[in-house]
């Protein structure tokens, strides 16, 4: 019997060539998008809310294809609405997807109404106002792909979009908003589907990147032989 001793290395200890081999070996057996189920769930909810059917779509780390979008239960006049008429139609029918009710309490002090919060609202004659705010709460399925998919709707109707990094809504630049004014209802719905697959493609691209692989190696304590052969990774 022979006893063989093998030195194991962490990813950061490998040579550049060994790192490339490790990354390529991992990619060769990990083809599925980790968040593919979430993408499909968001797409299903988009189809339900908009009354559409999306078929023959695809995406990977290199690109995406929205496939064929069938507008079930729509008529040509609705799809052709443009400008302010399109904005009004989308707001009335789908605005609830991106804007949430928000309550403001006001009290009357010395004959004037002023904003109040908390217990103060109980001290004086009060009235309540409601408005709507884009809070980025992922209203379709609870994952970030919802916000990406609905951003075109929020942009067209309200001139806002959700900044995932800042975790807040931001105003869309005026030049971008004006370009949107020429779009039709059909354009906006198609943009929502396109935005979903664009986000999925970018997420898939990051998943396959060397940066993400290095993070996974560190988080999971993966080890390698000197030439980059993976020893204990899933």
Residue ranges and their predicted role:
Residues 1-234:
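Alpha-helical propensity feature that highlights long, continuous alpha-helices across diverse contexts
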């Amino acid at each position: 019997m022979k006893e063989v001793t093998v030195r194991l290395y962490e990813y950061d200890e490998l040579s550049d060539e060994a790192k490339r081999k490790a990354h390529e070996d991992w990619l060769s057996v990990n083809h599925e998008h980790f968040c593919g189920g979430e993408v499909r769930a968001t797409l299903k909810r988009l189809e339900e809310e908009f009354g559409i059917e999306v078929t023959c779509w695809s995406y990977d780390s290199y690109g995406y294809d929205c496939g064929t979008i069938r507008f079930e239960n729509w008529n040509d006049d609705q799809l052709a609405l443009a400008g302010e008429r399109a904005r009004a139609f989308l707001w009335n029918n789908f605005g609830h997807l991106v804007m949430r009710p928000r309550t403001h309490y006001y009290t009357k002090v010395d004959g004037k109404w002023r904003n109040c919060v908390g217990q103060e609202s109980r001290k004086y004659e009060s009235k309540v106002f409601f408005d709507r705010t884009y809070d980025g709460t992922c209203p379709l399925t609870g994952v970030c792909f919802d916000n990406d998919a609905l951003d075109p709707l929020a942009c067209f109707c309200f001139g806002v979009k959700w900044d995932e990094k800042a975790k807040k809504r931001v105003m869309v630049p005026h030049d971008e908003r004006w370009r949107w004014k020429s779009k039709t209802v059909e354009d906006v719905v198609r943009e929502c589907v396109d935005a979903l697959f664009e986000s999925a493609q970018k997420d898939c691209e990051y998943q396959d990147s060397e940066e993400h692989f290095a993070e996974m190696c560190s988080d999971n304590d993966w080890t390698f032989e000197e030439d980059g052969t993976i020893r204990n990774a899933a």
